[in-house]
Each structure stands twice: as structure tokens, then as C-alpha cells.
Amino acid sequence: MSAGKIVQVIGAVVDVEFPRDQVPQIYDALVVDERGLTLEVQQQLGDGVVRTIAMGSSDGLTRSEKVSNTGNPISVPVGQGTLGRIMDVLGEPVDEAGEVKTDERWSIHRNAPSYEEQSGGQELLETGIKVIDLLCPFAKGGKVGLFGGAGVGKTVNMMELIRNIAVEHSGYSVFAGVGERTREGNDFYHEMKDSNVLDKVSLVYGQMNEPPGNRLRVALTGLTMAEYFRDEGRDVLMFIDNIYRYTLAGQEVSALLGRMPSAVGYQPTLAEEMGKLQERITSTKTGSITSVQAVYVPADDLTDPAPATTFAHLDATIVLSRQIAELGIYPAVDPLDSTSRQLDPLVIGQEHYDVARGVQGVLQRYKELKDIIAILGMDELSEEDKLTVSRARKIQRFLSQPFFVAEVFTGMPGKYVSLKDTVASFKAIIDGEYDHLPEQAFYMVGTVEEAAEKAKNL
């Protein structure tokens, strides 16, 4: 085990000098002897000096402090022992419940599965959320992005997905909190505890207040734990909240390492960093990883390089819209902007496909008529268009749904709607079977039968 000494500290970047014949390799983990702080090697500068990123606060570090090379990359505990626990980027527990007991530790830097190992699947994953199951269905082993600006409900949607999948499908999930609010992480833990699904979730947090090194690597820590479960032959869910902060941490590290910035100030290695992470999130012949990633959209601009780079890797994109949230419709999913590769009659069946396209057709027509309504009023529309508008407004309200995880705020019990009921309900609305009901009957209900029941009390 070679030993070196600190020669320079600039924020989270620490330069360490080693004897020339014992220079550590890129990604090796070094440990500052006095305080147990882990450093990860990023660059070899020559003359035995390596440039590292600190995986913790570098406050109080001094030059010439002794540093040891562990000779291996950062490794984290994997396996059953991680379930129900909150860990940091190094796999150390932060929930005050003793050490994480596992038989194995895996390096966080791993190669993506080869072509031969990968498998493509077409099986659908039912989420119980109407708008998602109908218009942007998830594939088992697919990647889903939840796009939205600040405060439109990315985290709440994600928590509902975890709750539904854990309760209804009883699968294992890994949640990586990357650069998000500590308060949300805390709420999330208690939410999981209260709904008795904590023993099926591993939680890995590197929150907003952590140094950039932690936020850059914590997604890899969570992914490594998910890969272990996948290689055991399980179907795992990997939740990342928020993938944008992973990019942002990369930008901070890149600037500290002195790289030249590219478009909008992002790191020049943006596409490569994103690809390294995303290519590992895949299904093999032994098991699958289905990932749901929240993507913060800076200033609601989807063409920003960070969300634009993420788009390329996803199978389904769920776009949350501020305009829909303003109408009080939650989940605020934009039904015309959200897409999925699975929305294909060969995968989901002809009936589901026709209903989904029918719903989008009605909403699209309503969008076109809005200008005419704004200028001339409803009375100038033809009878057919009036009917379209009335159905569109019903559909719009029917796309809302009370969430289990939001019961505390809304006072309404959550609803899980099966895919069969979802398709049947929307088909009935498009076919005009419920034209006689007032539109407010469709707001915040589960199935269309519940809407009919609600109408009796209006």
C-alpha cells in the first residue's frame, strides 16, 4: 500500500504526491490517514502527482498530510443487507441503525453488459397511474424520464410509482437521491416506513449540501446495488432523483479539474458521462433493471444540453407541464408531449393503442379550438366541435388521480387503477357513453364508474 502526501487543496480538488514508481491509477480510492476522508483519483499530472476529488468535506485539510492508496476503486456493500437502509456514496450507513452487514462489496466503476448478455423485452409494467398506463406505458427493463421544471411534481410522482410497484408487484427498488433536498429524503424514508415497503428499498443519498464528488458518484453507488440484485435474477427498479444534479455535479468537478467548458458552460464530457451511467442501466438474460429518472428542466427549457442529452437514452418520456399544474390537475402530465416506445399496437394491443390515440386526438382538437373559443366564444362552434370540447374537458379532468403518497395533503384516499379499467374507462368517454355527466364529476376519481357515482352527489 503506497503512501503519499497532500501538496495542494482547492475546494473539493486535492492534489497528492506519491513516489514516482507507486503512482495510483485513475479511479483508485485514496484515504487521508488522519481523518478517514476518501479521495478518488481523476488525473495523473506527472512527477508522481495525482489530482483527486474529495468524497466529503475538504475543510481543514492541510498540505503534507499523509495519504494512503487503497489500490482499488471505491467499493460499496451489495445484497440483502442494503434493503431498508439509508447509505451515503461510500455505502456507509447514515440512518443510525448500525453497520450495513453484507457478504460482498462491489466496485462502483463497472463495465456495461456486453451485447451478448443484453436482452430486449416487450413486457409492460403496470403502474396504476391512469395517464402513464394509457399514454406512455412503461416496459419492464426500460428507462423512463420524468421531465419537469421546479415544483410541478417530479418527486411526488416518483414516490407514488415506488409505492404502487412495491405494494402491487412486491419487487425490490433502489433509490438514489442525487443532489436533492434532504427534507425530501427524510419525508421519503418515513413515507416508505409508513406504507410498510421499506424492507424492499435500498436508499442511497448524496444530497444538495454534499460536495460535488459525492453527488457525482452517488448515482453509481445506487446503480451498483441494483446491478447486484439484477445479476441474482431479479427484476429491480432503479429510481434516480435527480439525474440533472448528476450532470451539474459533473460540471462542478469538470471546472475544478480545469477542463474547458462546452455549450452553456457544461462539461465537455457531458455525453460520455451520461452514457457511462445509462449504458449500465439495462436488462440482461438473468434479470432486469427498470429505471425511472426525474429530470429537472432548467427554466422549463427542454433544449438545454442536460435534458437534451438525457432524452437520447430513454424509452419513455413523461413531461410534467406547469400549465396543467395551474389548472389543478395532478399528476400534471402533458398528454400530448409525453411519449413511449411501447405505444405500438404490436406491444400494447390494438384496442389500447386506438383508445390512447383517440384520447390524444380529442385533446389535440381542443387545443386547436382554444383560440377560436377565446376570440368568438363557445357559441360560434359547430355542434360536433362543442361535443369534442366537452369530451376533451372531461378527459382532461379524468387524467387527474388522487395519489396514496399525497393523502396527507389532499385528504382524499389514493386510487390504484388497473390497466384494463383505464382503457375501458377512456374508451367509454370517447364513445360518448358519459356525455350526460358534468365535467367536475371526472375530477380526482379512479375509474369512470366512480365518476358516475360522484355525479349523483353533485
UniProtKB/Swiss-Prot annotation:
Enzyme class: translocase
Compartmental location: Cell inner membrane
Catalytic function, reaction form: ATP + H2O + 4 H(+)(in) = ADP + phosphate + 5 H(+)(out)
Entries under InterPro entries matching the protein: AAA+_ATPase (IPR003593), ATP-synt_VA_C (IPR055190), ATP_synth_F1_bsu (IPR005722), ATPase_a/bsu_AS (IPR020003), ATPase_alpha/beta_chains (IPR050053), ATPase_F1/V1/A1_a/bsu_N (IPR004100), ATPase_F1/V1/A1_a/bsu_N_sf (IPR036121), ATPase_F1/V1/A1_a/bsu_nucl-bd (IPR000194)
UniProt keyword list: ATP synthesis, ATP-binding, Cell inner membrane, Cell membrane, CF(1), Hydrogen ion transport, Ion transport, Membrane, Nucleotide-binding, Translocase, Transport
EC code: 7.1.2.2
GO CC annotations, alphabetized: plasma membrane; proton-transporting ATP synthase complex
Pfam family, one: ATP-synt_VA_C
UniProt cross-references to CDD domains, sorted A to Z: ATP-synt_F1_beta_C, ATP-synt_F1_beta_N, F1-ATPase_beta_CD
NCBIfam families per the UniProt record, alphabetical: atpD
HAMAP family, per the entry: ATP_synth_beta_bact
Family: Belongs to the ATPase alpha/beta chains family.
Protein name per Swiss-Prot or TrEMBL: ATP synthase subunit beta
Originating species: Halorhodospira halophila (strain DSM 244 / SL1)
